[in-house]
């Protein structure tokens, strides 16, 4: 442990009086201001329903008021009128009503989002906005054909994958949370992490891009120009207009889709924490131990030397030793990777998934998703320190990064040596009772099972953080170059802030790798890729076949976070400027930063982001907007933010 991090472990400077052991251990286990609460509903006849009831709604509309609060708690509204249609046919009637009365409809599910694509923070109860909750009733799932599924857009991804599994089917990749709606995933081009491993051929029904690209047919609420009324219309994937609806950002309303899937392929998921970031994210051609800097700031040393020695033993058991050491190496071998690099630490949590038909002897067999209980249910020490951070102890971020790293290492590998050699405060936080609890469920470093059990691993009970998000489009041979450039700059920027006594990141960097949206994956002749997908290929750069997804996580309200995110975003735009690689934003997360806020830079919103989906020629940004406007000319499905973006 470095001298600076040792000091941090006893008394963290930068907060009034420092963060003493007594203050920390006396803190509430709750997350305080970071906690996300599901607000109750208020019916139209309740005395608490202050806003006038929307006039003239279609008969039988299930109506109530509810606060909209998103995943991170950054978007919170007044009580807004909300309805829950029981059938898809109710939605066109609601759209007709909204048009006639000057209201707008916003589809809503489990609110697992960051960007203001549904509603803006602070939307008042008097706003003429009607939330349409699809998650109550529009949840039907049924078999359409042997390799397709018909699913209503309010169904959860967990329910969808469970249905597919019961039929022996699966997806190659999908978002990690299970409690998110299918409609929400499609709206933003949700993805997982997967590219073909060396020698792997895409099986029928599978794809390496977004979930949206697996759609073969969709039903949307559109205006019928002949009658002037809204109606349900089904678009086959072969129809040109369908490409605008596959990723629509909330500018449309889908009631159901038909998705293609393939025969399920069991996966083996191996976790390891024995490769330092300087090797995992090394520049191409760098020798072992060289790469993206030599340290990660205060706290980097805690898992350092020991992590390398003991992790090497673990790595030998799990296929390490003389095996892959860089991210690109693991991608080449397994095709499916995720790196979680806790702030101010040196050893990322690397997960790799490999297609493995039969259970390996050393693997733990699992038959349900969410197999990382230490991550799903926040351990008490992590909750304590998180509570301290969000109430002002921002300088404890290096300590928090170390704590998260140690919790993951103990729970995954059973190795407590780093805990025993850590500072007094960390040893006190990770008491014998806590360690016993972490180890009680068995080690989780090597899992095997049906794909859905290993693709979904984020519960709503995990830490609620905010995140930025970007996709770097690059040729696969340049994957390691792009990752190493990012890692070096991120480390440099974080260290510069720390040198000034600022700690803008207290979560982690997450890195995933996917393919692009090849419409052949849908199995529909004449299909086009989703026009607004960050994974839409560029016609002029056919060699760009890979996307690297980058997220930086932190608690909302962290001082300097937006300024840090802006500096990082501007660097990404300069570095991946279309010459060797390109950059697109991840719609659901943070982007277009000013020094004060996300989704606020007028140049990014008005020029840079649209141009990223215009570049390369062919149908793209402008065609998508034209199609969506043509099918909803009254902009019933929209909000002021989308009005400014999609123009």
Give short role names for the model-derived ranges.
Residues 11-32:
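N-terminal secretory signal peptides and thylakoid transit peptides that target proteins
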Residues 17, 38-76:
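C-terminal segment of N-terminal export signals and the immediately downstream linker at the start
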Residues 104-106, 168-176, 227-233, 267-268, ...:
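Short secondary-structure capping/junction motifs at helix and strand boundaries
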Residues 122-124, 434-647:
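Conserved glycine-rich FAD pyrophosphate-binding loop
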Residues 73-173:
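Glycine-rich N-terminal segment of FAD-binding domains in flavoprotein oxidoreductases
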Residues 115-138, 192-225, 253-257:
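Structural signature of FAD isoalloxazine-binding scaffolds in flavoprotein oxidoreductases
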Residues 215-507, 512-513:
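C-terminal substrate-binding/cap subdomain adjacent to the FAD-binding core in PCMH-type
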């Amino acid at each position: 442990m470095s001298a600076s991090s040792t000091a941090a472990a006893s008394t963290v400077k930068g907060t009034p009086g420092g963060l003493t052991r007594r203050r920390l251990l006396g803190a509430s286990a709750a997350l305080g201001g970071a906690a996300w609460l599901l607000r109750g509903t208020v019916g139209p006849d309740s005395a608490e329903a202050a806003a006038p009831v929307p006039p003239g709604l279609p008969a039988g509309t299930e109506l109530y008021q509810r606060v909209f609060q998103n995943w991170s708690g950054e978007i919170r509204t007044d009580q807004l009128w909300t309805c829950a249609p029981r059938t898809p046919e109710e939605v066109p009637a609601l759209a007709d009503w909204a048009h006639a009365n000057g209201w707008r409809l916003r589809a809503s599910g489990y609110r697992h989002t960051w960007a203001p694509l549904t509603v803006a923070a602070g939307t008042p109860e008097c706003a003429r906005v009607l939330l349409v909750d699809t998650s109550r009733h529009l949840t039907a799932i049924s078999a359409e054909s042997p390799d397709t599924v018909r699913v209503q857009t309010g169904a959860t991804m967990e329910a969808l994958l469970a249905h597919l599994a019961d039929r022996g089917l699966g997806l190659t990749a999908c978002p990690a949370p299970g409690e998110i709606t299918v409609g929400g995933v499609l709206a933003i081009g949700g993805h997982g992490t997967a590219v073909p491993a060396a020698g792997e051929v895409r099986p029928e029904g599978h794809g390496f891009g977004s979930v949206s690209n697996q759609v073969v047919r969709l039903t949307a609420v559109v205006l019928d120009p002949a009658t002037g009324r809204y109606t349900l219309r089904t678009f086959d994937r072969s129809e040109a207009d369908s490409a605008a609806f596959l990723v629509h950002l909330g500018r449309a309303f889908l009631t159901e889709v038909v998705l293609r899937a393939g025969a399920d392929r069991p996966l083996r998921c191996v976790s390891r924490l024995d490769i330092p970031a300087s090797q995992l994210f090394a520049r191409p051609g760098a020798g072992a131990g060289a790469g993206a800097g030599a340290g990660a700031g205060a706290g980097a040393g805690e898992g350092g030397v020991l992590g390398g020695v003991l992790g090497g033993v673990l790595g030998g058991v799990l296929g390490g030793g003389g095996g892959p050491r860089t991210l690109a190496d693991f991608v080449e071998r397994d095709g499916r990777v995720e790196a979680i690099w806790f702030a101010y630490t040196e050893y990322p949590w690397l997960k790799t998934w490999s297609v493995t038909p039969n259970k390996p002897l050393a693997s733990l067999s699992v038959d349900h998703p969410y197999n990382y209980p230490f991550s799903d249910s926040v351990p008490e020490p992590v909750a304590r320190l998180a509570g301290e951070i969000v109430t002002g102890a921002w300088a404890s971020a290096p300590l928090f990064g170390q704590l998260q790293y140690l919790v993951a290492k103990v729970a995954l590998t059973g190795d407590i040596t780093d805990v025993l050699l850590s500072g007094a405060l960390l040893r006190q936080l990770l008491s014998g009772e806590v360690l016993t609890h972490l180890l009680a469920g068995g080690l989780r470093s090597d899992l095997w099972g049906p794909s859905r059990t290993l693709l979904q691993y984020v519960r709503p009970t995990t830490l609620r953080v905010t995140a930025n998000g970007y996709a770097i489009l690059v040729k696969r041979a340049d994957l390691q170059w792009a990752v190493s450039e990012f890692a070096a700059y991120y480390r440099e920027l974080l260290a510069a802030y720390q040198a000034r006594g600022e700690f803008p990141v207290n979560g982690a960097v997450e890195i995933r790798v996917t393919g692009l949206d090849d419409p052949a994956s849908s199995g529909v002749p004449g299909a086009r890729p989703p026009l607004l997908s960050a994974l839409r290929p560029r016609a002029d750069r056919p060699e760009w076949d890979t996307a690297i997804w980058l997220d930086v996580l932190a608690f909302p309200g962290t001082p300097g976070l937006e300024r840090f995110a802006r500096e990082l975003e501007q660097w990404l735009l300069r570095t991946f400027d279309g010459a060797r690689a390109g950059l697109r934003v991840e719609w659901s997360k943070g982007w277009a930063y000013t020094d004060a806020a996300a989704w606020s830079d007028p140049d990014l919103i008005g020029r840079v982001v649209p141009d990223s989906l215009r570049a390369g020629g062919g149908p793209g940004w402008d065609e998508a907007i034209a199609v969506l406007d043509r099918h909803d000319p009254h902009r019933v499905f929209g909000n002021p933010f989308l009005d400014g973006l999609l123009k």
